[in-house]
Design a protein with these regions (language model features):
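Amphipathic alpha-helical assembly segments
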Residues: 1-192
Length: 192
């Protein structure tokens, strides 16, 4: 779980990478805890996850880091970590490999897969939206369970994840899409 060290580290990250005042950073930490509780996710797990992914936070954070904190909640609801969300986002921004994976998956699955929206969202640092856009393309748990090993691997490659992580996502897809919608309505206020 989160320790005082994690909290102190996060306060420093918020101030250094997002140019927040000490009070704004503290408010962001409090709001993140409230967001986690509101979504039935252990706040200490969210704070620890973000504290362990400082490079990802520095690279993709916007609006004081609110987008990454919401993505951390989304990840936990999917049974994932921020490192998985980073793999998805970074994979989308590797345009050549992302397009190749998209074409291969489309051929192997016999259906059109289009990650253009997900790539655009990732490029705009909308980590949460990019993840939701990828989830929308994966198909249902029922469809996933009918796939053979090669098809499952190609779908995992498409998402930039291991098959086990992908399996968690498709089994929680409805929850993920509902969560993404709910999170977009919840705001994390960083300014008192």
């Amino acid at each position: 779980g989160a320790t005082l060290t994690d909290s102190a580290k996060l306060l420093g990250i918020f101030k250094e990478t997002q140019n927040l005042t000490a009070q704004q950073a503290e408010n962001l930490l409090i709001s993140t805890t409230e967001l986690a509780v509101a979504n039935n996710v252990a706040p200490d797990k969210i704070l620890a996850d973000v504290a362990q992914n400082t490079e990802f936070f520095a690279k993709f954070a916007e609006d004081g880091g609110e987008n990454i904190l919401r993505a951390a909640v989304q990840a936990k609801k999917l049974g994932l970590e921020l490192t998985d969300i980073e793999k998805i986002t970074s994979g989308l921004l590797d345009f050549q490999n992302s397009l190749n994976a998209e074409i291969e998956a489309s051929v192997l699955l016999g259906r059109n897969i289009n990650l253009q929206k997900a790539r655009e969202l990732a490029l705009a640092n909308d980590v949460e939206g990019a993840t939701a856009a990828v989830v929308e393309q994966l198909g249902s748990a029922e469809e996933f369970n009918k796939l053979n090993a090669i098809q499952r691997q190609k779908l995992a490659d498409l998402a930039g994840l291991e098959v086990s992580a992908l399996s968690k996502i498709v089994n929680k897809e409805k929850e993920a899409l509902t969560l993404s919608s709910a999170l977009s309505k919840q705001q994390v206020d960083i300014i008192p």
